[in-house]
Amino acid sequence: MATDARGVVAITGATGFLGRHLVRALAQDGWRPRVLVRRDPVHPFWRDLEVEVVTGDLGTPRALDRLAKGAEVFIHVAGLIKARTLEGFNRVNQDGARAAAEAARAAGARFILVSSLAAREPSLSNYAASKRAGEDAVRAADPSALIVRPPAIYGPGDTETLGLFQLAARSPVLPVLSQTSRVAMIHVEDAAAKLVAFCRTPVLGLVELSDVRRDGYTWTEIMRGAAHVMGAKPRLIRLPDPGILTAGALVDAWSSLTNTPSVFGLGKARELLHTDWTPSSAPMAEGVPSKFGLIDGFTHTVDWYRAAGWLPKNIVA
């Protein structure tokens, strides 16, 4: 752990998956995390840390001003991953990003927007369009801001990836999406470490992150990797693109009928079938190298799941 005292880092989205790890990584590097939360209680992941809490949300200007005041860096991690309409996404991913950037600039804090690699292809989905809109809003509010686009993030505490390992262990078959797609991945600890490095060393412009394999992975490699760390050998079955798109459209129809947003839908199906989700920025722009590749990252994650009781320790295929 670093011993040199650093400044205050303001963080939105601190109770989310990446945000929780980021707060810990910043504190361990000597920074003083200040987080925006809707409710006051400190998250269990931070119980042993000194974390300053500001109560409020992205729609509360006074809370954003308190969050940003005196901060050296402002990292905006908060975002919406499911909404029924583009307008619903934009209220958080565009308007919230703009409000955070404006508060940071007024306070004289360097601003870092954690966006998504999906923003590179805004025509694919409402989510992707809203993330690009958020980037554009931040550039307009603060041209000196750094925009960081992580790919798919996984690691300890991730509830989304848990289902992949459960399926890999128990199912005799695993679905494989487009055989031509390449998908970048990053372990959450690597993503947090890179953001901490950007706090130490100012970077401008746009950076796209990855793990040790900047050319990404095929869906076959990802599914085989998940099965491997679970000690399973399921058969891989290629899902046809039209079937995936149809499933997405049906989910959208049900979401509209029930007025219940879903992460998966036609837009997400298009994202999953897109051929290139690998970083285009120079590797040196990431600041620090990644530690984890796919297999050791998956192994580290599964070890955590088992220790936490999220996966049985004796689970077999």
Curated annotation (Swiss-Prot):
GO terms for cellular component: membrane; periplasmic space. InterPro entries: ComplexI_NDUFA9_subunit, Epimerase_deHydtase, NAD(P)-bd_dom_sf. Keywords: Lipid metabolism, Oxidoreductase, Periplasm, Signal. It catalyses: N-acyl-3-oxosphinganine + NADH + H(+) = an N-acylsphinganine + NAD(+). Residues 1-27 form the signal peptide. Disruption phenotype: Deletion mutant cannot form dihydroceramide. Deletion of the gene results in a ceramide molecule with a mass reduction of 2 Da, corresponding to a loss of two hydrogens. Mutants are impaired in growth at elevated temperatures but are resistant towards the antibiotic polymyxin B. It comes from the Bacteria. Pathway: Lipid metabolism; sphingolipid metabolism. GO terms for molecular function: oxidoreductase activity; protein-containing complex binding. It is an enzyme of class 1 (oxidoreductase). Its EC number is 1.-.-.-. It is found in: Periplasm. One of its GO terms (biological process) is sphingolipid metabolic process. Pfam families: Epimerase. Its main location: periplasm. The bacterial ceramide synthesis pathway operates in a different order from that in eukaryotes. Furthermore, phylogenetic analyses support the hypothesis that the bacterial and eukaryotic ceramide pathways evolved independently. Belongs to the NAD(P)-dependent epimerase/dehydratase family. Involved in de novo bacterial ceramide synthesis. Catalyzes the reduction of bacterial oxidized ceramides to bacterial dihydroceramides. This is Ceramide reductase. It comes from Caulobacter vibrioides (strain NA1000 / CB15N) (Caulobacter crescentus). The gene is cerR.
